[in-house]
Design a protein with these regions (language model features):
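Acidic/His-rich structured neighborhood in mature extracellular/periplasmic domains
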Residues: 33-39, 46-48, 52-56, 63-67, ...
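Generic detection of long, well-ordered alpha-helical segments
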Residues: 72-83, 174, 257-268
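Acidic, Ser/Thr/Gly/Pro-rich low-complexity segments and short DxT(G/T)-type signature motifs
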Residues: 3-32
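Short, well-structured beta-strand segments enriched in hydrophobic/aromatic residues
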Residues: 1-4, 232-233
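A general structural signal for short secondary-structure junctions and capping/turn motifs
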Residues: 18, 59, 97-101, 220-223
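Metalloprotease/metallohydrolase-associated module, dominated by Zn2+-dependent proteases
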Residues: 69, 128-158, 163-165, 204-288
Length: 288
């Protein structure tokens, strides 16, 4: 497990890239998470995909207006669970989902064994953003990437979404770390909160600075920067993180909503304004 593989797409730069025509008019409704279902079918013509996208994407699910896309190799169950994850995460703040859609955000899931650069938005990452030491983006970002304004795709992988034993983010005890959820948390930050709630992000920065000053997440990924503090906190909020005691450079003993409330009440309070309490991330029912 190499935590740096989870780095957010926020670090990619500002090169121009496509944005889907996601214009849509609908009425949001307050549904219980148990009411959410996602059907997988062919990509509708109304998405106006460009040639590269048309060549790759062949499967589609609708997360209340946000396209969830995959290619020929992805299992439909992976798109279904990714779609349901989005619906579950965003049930409290569908205004943020609406802004993400208005900003052209889509979600994508690669098939088992595919590299992240199979996704059209990421196909040039090795050329545009070469990594040190000869690493490739397929190795570095094995679990997915968050959406940016330049590359508005929030992604994950089939093996992580469906908790395959081959998933590099699965603990030996069989508890899977939900990287799709982690990256979508980054996407909510950059594709919605940055536009609609800059004061919230100022509060988040203050909470992070206080956490660092008090060594709350020393020797963990959450300590690296405010973006990872947020995404790691969201994972714990949804009970979809790993734990380590003592800290191992990636995690510490905090990996649940209850533990977050005790150890970092400021972050817990902030997250409670964005995400619901009636949804948990992680493996779908029947996962290996």
């Amino acid at each position: 497990l190499v935590k740096q593989r989870r780095e957010s797409g926020k670090r990619h730069g500002n090169d121009d890239l496509y944005a889907l025509n996601a214009a849509r008019t609908w009425d949001f409704t307050a549904n219980a998470v148990s009411d959410y279902t996602c059907a997988v079918g062919p990509v509708p013509a109304g998405l106006n995909l460009n040639a590269d996208q048309q060549a790759y994407y062949s499967k589609y699910a609708d997360a209340n207006g946000m396209p969830v896309l995959g290619g020929n190799l992805v299992a439909p169950a992976a798109l279904t669970h990714a779609c349901e994850t989005i619906l579950g995460m965003m049930s409290l703040r569908q205004d943020l989902l609406e802004r993400m859609i208005a900003n052209g955000t889509i979600a994508a899931v690669t098939g088992d064994g595919e590299g992240i650069t199979q996704i059209p938005a990421y196909s040039d990452l090795d050329a545009v953003f070469p990594l040190p030491g000869g690493d490739t983006w397929d190795e570095r970002a094995r679990g997915g990437l968050g959406a940016t304004k330049a590359r508005p795709v929030s992604s994950g992988t089939e093996e992580n979404v469906l908790c395959y034993p081959s998933d590099p983010y699965q603990a030996p005890v069989g508890v899977d770390e939900d990287i799709f959820l982690h990256e979508f948390a980054h996407s909510v930050d950059l594709m919605a909160l940055a536009d609609l709630e800059p004061d919230f992000l100022n509060e988040l920065r203050a909470a992070y600075d206080d956490a660092v000053a008090n060594n709350l997440f020393e020797n963990t990924y959450a300590d690296d920067n405010v973006e990872e503090y947020w995404a790691e906190g969201v994972q714990s909020w949804f009970n979809a993180n790993l734990e380590s005691d003592p800290p191992n450079g990636l995690h510490n003993s905090v990996n649940t909503r209850a533990e977050l409330a005790t150890d970092d009440p400021a972050l817990h309070s902030l997250i409670s304004r964005i995400f619901p309490t009636d949804y948990d991330g992680g493996c779908p029912p029947g996962a290996p």
